[in-house]
Amino acid sequence: MDDDDFDDIPDEDLMLAFTQATGNITSHHPSNSKQLASSAKPPAQAWPISDSARRIVTPTVSQGQATATGRAKTASKPTTSATTSRPSLAQSSQRKNLRQTTLWGGTLEEDAQPAPQAVSNRPFRADMPPEQPTHHEIDIEEMKTWVYPMNLGPIRDYQFSIVKNGLFNNTLVALPTGLGKTFIAATIMLNYIRWTKTAKAVFVAPTKPLASQQVQACLSIAGIPRSQATLLTGETPPVLREDEWATKRLFFMTPQTLMNDLSKGYADPKSIVLLVIDEAHRATGDYAYVKVVEFLRRFSKSFRILALTATPGSSLEGVQDVIDNLGISHVEIRTEESIDIRQYVHSRDINTITFDPSDEMMEVRDLFSKALKPLVTKLSSQNIYYGRDPMSLTTYGLMKARNDWMAGPGRHVNQGTKFSVIATFAILQSLAHSIKLLNFHGIKPFYNNLAEFRTTEEEKGGKGSKLKRQVLEDENFQKMMDMIEGWMKIDGFLGHPKLEYLCETLVNHFMDAGEGSNTRAIVFSEYRDSAEEIVRILNKQPLIKATVFVGQADSKRSEGMKQKQQIETIEKFKNGAHNVLVATSIGEEGLDIGQVDLIVCYDASASPIRMLQRMGRTGRKRAGNIVLLLMKGKEEDKFNEAKDNYATMQRMICEGSRFTFRHDLSSRIVPRDIRPEVEKKVVEIPLENSQNPELPEPKRSAARMRTKPAKKKFNMPDGVETGFIKASFFGQAGAKTAKPPARPPAPKETDFIAERPKLESILLSTSQENELRRNYTKIPLGHSKVEELDIDWYRHPTSRRVVQKTIHVKHGEYTKRCVKLFRSLAKSQAPANRYTKPYGETDTSSWELIPLPPLADETEGETSRKGQKKRPRLESGQEAEEAEQYAAPKKRQATAKTKSTGVSKQTNKPRARHTALISDCEEGGNEYDGNVDDDEQSRPRNFRSKGRGRGSGRGKKSQPKQGDPNVDYGDDCTRTSDMEMGTDGSDDGADLEDFIVSDGEVTSSLQHRPRGSTSPTTAPDAGSSSLSSKTGRKQQAPDSFASDEDDGDVFGPKFVPVTASAAKGSLPSTARREKPKPFYVPVELPATQDTTDGDDDLPDIEFLSAKRKREGTGTGMRTGSPGHVKVGDTSKGGSGGDQTREKPSGGAASHARARKRTVVMDSDDDQE
């Protein structure tokens, strides 16, 4: 029967196929010509038939008709009645008399004959809408077969049947523990991964230990490559989970993790084709299983569900909830008495042991009952709680009584009475748990619970509940606690008769097994306190190595076990490090712990599910023993009730008449024209599955170092309109936003494919090959290898500090910042190393040893910047360093000075001594100002200084503003004596006779003027004309400027000097022989009316000269008449030519009277 073609066909499909086959024979009988005529016409409506019935009906139809039927859409194309309709033996007379009429009684179609209809016991097939094809990308060739692995030995009939139905239906599999539910799941996952190209299969389990256990089983049975599988938990970072969903196809995880990944968009619900649910009896209420399936159905209906459990439920309603929530359409259930699994179930010897309370327990119960009697009497006297015995209190009974009273009489009592009753119920509910611990688990857990109750109340002081203090201060309660404390000090005190029997049972079991045996035992306890007490007692016994196995939650007296610790504990138990495992409810479900020969249930549970799960831990591979330790009375009754309930539920599920299955939610994934055939073979296990024993958990690597996951993805069902619409469209039928015009398709690379050129046009000619060989492929003579030249990044450093000229595009903000930065870095270097080349060559000119002339007076060397002090006298070692800082004035200062004078003079050729200084001045002249454009810098500016008002004393000096061009002006006078003019080299002061004092002279200089001097009201024109005639230069118009790009302009914009040949006079012979001065162009400016109105005091030249001599600042000397000033500089050695500068003191001096003197240092040696 295993290989029979029709062994998997339900009985109702067989009956339907027989009916259709008989109908076809009757319809073709020659005696019924009318039916023959009607059967030749196409039917008005096509009816789908089941797959099982189609396999039987097909032989009665021609091969062409069968092929057309298999590929046609149901209810979409009319076909022959033999293949798509359901004819019956006799047509219904009622159906023949029906005809469609109009509203006025006329017949719509007189000649139309109704299509033959068949009477079916399955009306849902006719009511179902047309099936939609799956959206998953399938592999047609692989789908023609489905693989049944033969790796585990002979085929088990029940496993083969369940796998066959689970591939095509949403199936609930209920098998006793240890009968291969994992093998069934692995086989179905293997086939769906084969059938689809990119779809994913997900295995969900309630806990991580269960999920981890299924990973190894599926990889070793089904042969799915380990590289395509992954284990995801809540501890996995979201970034790694997102990457795993994009690359893997088989997932093992908890339902909570799957729900989070679906809701956050890491997992695509449309990509899941198979969902395997372990411990499916949990799929009730708001559990994560229910939420996951609901979420998937919102976006996709083309996925298969396989639910695995040992006990579907404890009631009819619970089983129906599982069927509805998971969309189950088929149930495969087996019991231990089923024929096809009986040979695979090992015998289990169940021993039930009942106990009576010990004397110590009776004494404790009596004292505790007296302590609780006042509270119970208070409730019973008001007809709120009808129990009289305090030791029969239960948490559920008290909660139900309180809710009934609050819904009834409690609504009409005053608030004081209501609060008092609620407080009494709360205290009794907390103490009812202690009563349960005393009756079923022992005195020690009972004492620990009450000690915690007492400690919590004592910590509150006098602010706690009065009713709790009443219980704690009761004489019977205190006596009971003192008595228990005395018992616990006794060595070997057990506290419950179950503990004594448990120790004896386990010791006898290991003694009978013999030393070195591989036998193990599991003890199940409901509460953690009781489990820890059992471990403490068992470890004192010989041959017993016990350990506890609890959940992850922390209690008030102990910590939970992390998932890693749980897995390690199970591995140690399998390896033999521990031979007794004391577990709570976490060890009841699904754990394949290994060869367990003895199960001890320390307490009984009223739930048949938990009872069967506990018993299923043994008897998997060999016969096992089960010992039930029950207390007489209530606990024994609960066990019997659970046992009867389990047998009743198994019988009802097998019948199937009490449940409604959801065929509408079990969509077809395999196309109807494809009929997969079984292929029984040994599946090859990839080598990678056995090489790495670790779990396939994702690990963070260097290539996956993203710290943030991608943005949340919002999944939308098919056909949903997304985006925004106008507010005016609301309420309008079919209102949609206007679609933008379609863009032309982007050009493809193939559109620009050029024609293939001729071979001669792309190959090198003979001459080109010789040139290639001579110039590029051959090494030059005398070279052993090809030279590689490195770019010298230190060449031309000064070009980086200047903003070069542009034509069409201006320099950007970043370019100007970089230039300014390089200029600042250049200024920060030491002067001694500034001109040293980086490649080892140094300047041998010894320019540092050239002596510098003495500096100007401190009163004239005030700097213009805010906060800077006067320039001090420098030593010889510092002269070279400070020379450059004072040798290059600002560009705008030079511009303002040039504009104020209005005349430029021709300078001599610069000396070789100042070559380095000039390069720095060029850099300073183009210094970038962030607030001024290049164009604005090139324009001349007319700055006018404001003098101080007259007053009796020296007024407070105003602070200079940033960027003000007048900040370098002096206090009382304007000196232009630094203009370099041709002199005869003498030092008698005759070259300063043209320093004419005009009307702009202030009172500070008049007090030192001789009485016979020229009047200060001299006309400005005369002064300027005389100055021009004596200097022998023409006055230049103010608007005749030189170009900014002139190499000689080291201080910015300047006037075009007039050549010597055009001057009225001629320079002295000494000046003609000298080279032009290197860094300054003297200018002249005629006096104006504005410059004669100055009111600042100008100190006398003789007074300043005498002061300088007293201070010893230099050997310089100032002599001459009040109208002229002569400045002489002497060298250190006393030799060398003197420089004399002559400057008018008329209108030009008054206009720039607030300007400081610009210090220009020069060498005393004028000779080449």
UniProtKB/Swiss-Prot annotation:
The keyword Hydrolase applies. Residues 71-88 have a biased composition (Low complexity). Transmembrane segments: none annotated. GO terms for molecular function: 3'-5' DNA helicase activity; ATP binding; ATP hydrolysis activity; four-way junction DNA binding; four-way junction helicase activity. It comes from the Eukaryota. Residues 24-132, 690-717, 830-1168 are annotated as: Disordered. PROSITE patterns: HELICASE_ATP_BIND_1, HELICASE_CTER. A motif (DEAH box) lies at residues 278-281. Keywords: ATP-binding, DNA damage, DNA repair, DNA-binding, Helicase, Hydrolase, Nucleotide-binding, Nucleus. Residues 162-330 form the Helicase ATP-binding domain. Disulfide bonds: none annotated. It is found in: Nucleus. SMART domains: DEXDc, HELICc. Residues 24-38, 59-68, 89-104, 895-907, 1001-1030 have a biased composition (Polar residues). It catalyses: ATP + H2O = ADP + phosphate + H(+). InterPro entries: FANCM/Mph1-like_ID, FANCM_DEXDc, Helicase/UvrB_N, Helicase_ATP-bd, Helicase_C-like, P-loop_NTPase. Residues 701-714, 941-959 have a biased composition (Basic residues). Residues 920-936, 985-996 have a biased composition (Acidic residues). ATP-dependent DNA helicase involved in DNA damage repair by homologous recombination and in genome maintenance. Capable of unwinding D-loops. Plays a role in limiting crossover recombinants during mitotic DNA double-strand break (DSB) repair. Component of a FANCM-MHF complex which promotes gene conversion at blocked replication forks, probably by reversal of the stalled fork. Belongs to the DEAD box helicase family. DEAH subfamily. FANCM sub-subfamily. This is ATP-dependent DNA helicase mph1. It comes from Neurospora crassa (strain ATCC 24698 / 74-OR23-1A / CBS 708.71 / DSM 1257 / FGSC 987). The gene is mph1.
